């Protein structure tokens, strides 16, 4: 939780505790209600979040959870210490990679946004690790640009989303180098 005060999140914490679950709060705000209601807390300390899109706190929370997963994997013996060290080094390199990305995509952003700024709807499709990226991308588009958008698992697109498309609908596909890349590429061909 970014603020640690969202009513829905606090209700989920209460339900989880009533069911006997151990609750971990990952938040940016020290002393928030979520921190008081949880069994353990990880503070991201990402600084004040000014924008509604909460990009900074989202990225910090993903990084915190990834670090937790790496440590658990090391303790359980599913990842050797050397690999954990390598992966933590990759996390630390993210700011430089973000700078490179911003520099490399700026022209494309101008061109693509100029072509699609007046569209009434965007569809995001992804599989595997690309699906949560699509969900967050669709949310960011709604929050920042006020453009209606939705995100779906690409394998489910025939069960509704494809009916929303016409020849002008922008479809954002996140295709990662994953074991199911071929299936994602097939989905991309279907929406062309």
Language model features with spans:
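Active-site phosphate/pyrophosphate-binding segments
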Residues: 40-170
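Glycine-rich phosphate-binding loops that contact phosphosugars or nucleotide phosphates
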Residues: 1-93, 176-179, 183-192
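C-terminal active-site/capping subdomain that shapes the small-molecule cofactor and substrate pocket
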Residues: 151, 158-161, 167-192
């Amino acid at each position: 939780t970014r603020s640690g005060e969202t009513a829905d999140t606090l209700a989920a914490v209460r339900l989880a505790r009533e069911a006997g679950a151990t609750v971990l709060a990952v938040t940016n705000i020290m002393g928030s209600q979520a921190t008081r209601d949880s069994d353990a807390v990880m503070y991201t300390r990402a600084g004040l979040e000014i924008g509604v899109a909460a990009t900074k706190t989202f990225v910090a929370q993903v990084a915190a959870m990834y670090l937790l997963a790496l440590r658990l994997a090391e303790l359980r013996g599913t990842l050797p210490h050397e690999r954990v060290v390598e992966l933590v080094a990759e996390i630390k390199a993210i700011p430089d990679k973000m700078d490179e990305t911003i520099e490399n995509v700026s022209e494309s952003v101008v061109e693509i946004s100029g072509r699609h700024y007046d569209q009434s709807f965007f569809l995001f499709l992804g599989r595997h690790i690309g699906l949560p990226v699509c969900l967050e991308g669709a949310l960011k588009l709604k929050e920042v640009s006020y453009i209606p958008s939705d995100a779906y698992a690409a394998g489910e697109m025939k069960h509704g989303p494809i009916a929303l498309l016409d020849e002008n609908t922008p479809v954002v596909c996140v295709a990662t180098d994953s074991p199911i890349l071929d299936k994602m590429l097939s989905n991309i061909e279907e929406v062309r």
